């Protein structure tokens, strides 16, 4: 999967807005362009929360895509923009925001 931190998405949009667009109908993908294995993503969350998840593996489901990530080459070519946030930092920032916003204590977070 391609996980993209919100600040990178906002910066990507600003890069487009701040610069004249040669083709006003061109579509740009904004994403991380670095696929992350789902188990690696889960491991990052576990580490940030200092909790261990119970993982149940299932067969691939109809409609599931094996690999998916954004091709951001046009965004880079036209605006020299690349996302900067790695998965560890982005997940940590999101979890910190979530716990603070919802006033949840990490040790009280119920995971199922």
Regions found by a protein language model. Name each.
Residues 1-112:
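C-terminal substrate-binding subdomain of Rossmann-fold SDR/epimerase-dehydratase oxidoreductases
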